[in-house]
Amino acid sequence: MLHVKTIEGQFDAKGLKFAIIATRFNDFIVDRLVGGAVDYLARHGCEREDMTIVRIPGAFEMPIVAQKLAKSGRYHGIIALGAVIRGATPHFDFVAGEATKGLAHISLDSGVPVGFGLLTTDSIEQAIERAGTKAGNKGVEAAAAVLETVRVMEQL
């Protein structure tokens, strides 16, 4: 086997600060995502006083809030949590697409990892499945991805 330097992130959140953006729209689903993210970070060493939850109206507002948080310099990582459920109009496509693009730009422009926990589903049932039932909890997954990315970036 070839021996090459490998950089991996450790799942240790001690001493790190995180902002969690949570939409109020579909809050009965988003609250489960938030609970999963907070629990994950706490179990991995992050103190609750080092987590800030920022409630916003909906997914479309995520990028501007993430940008402000990233520019503040107070957070090692940002976790964006929300749920956009497809309806009968193209509204879903516009909101989900713009939020996704905006969050990616914020992460790239600022250098602050932004975890993508925005559910984009065809039904309420699918959203519930991804908020802690059959398909796991995407809030946990977004928190884990941000934590690992923060720790990788410290080594680059």
UniProtKB/Swiss-Prot annotation:
Gene3D superfamilies: Lumazine/riboflavin synthase. SUPFAM superfamilies: Lumazine synthase. GO terms for biological process: riboflavin biosynthetic process. InterPro entries: LS, LS/RS, LS/RS_sf. Pfam families: DMRL_synthase. It comes from the Bacteria. (2S)-2-hydroxy-3-oxobutyl phosphate binds at A88, T89, R130. 5-amino-6-(D-ribitylamino)uracil binds at F25, A59, F60, E61, A83, V84, I85, F116. It is an enzyme of class 2 (transferase). The active site is at H91. Keywords: Riboflavin biosynthesis, Transferase. Its EC number is 2.5.1.78. GO terms for cellular component: cytosol; riboflavin synthase complex. The keyword Transferase applies. Pathway: Cofactor biosynthesis; riboflavin biosynthesis; riboflavin from 2-hydroxy-3-oxobutyl phosphate and 5-amino-6-(D-ribitylamino)uracil: step 1/2. It catalyses: (2S)-2-hydroxy-3-oxobutyl phosphate + 5-amino-6-(D-ribitylamino)uracil = 6,7-dimethyl-8-(1-D-ribityl)lumazine + phosphate + 2 H2O + H(+). GO terms for molecular function: 6,7-dimethyl-8-ribityllumazine synthase activity. Belongs to the DMRL synthase family. Catalyzes the formation of 6,7-dimethyl-8-ribityllumazine by condensation of 5-amino-6-(D-ribitylamino)uracil with 3,4-dihydroxy-2-butanone 4-phosphate. This is the penultimate step in the biosynthesis of riboflavin. This is 6,7-dimethyl-8-ribityllumazine synthase.
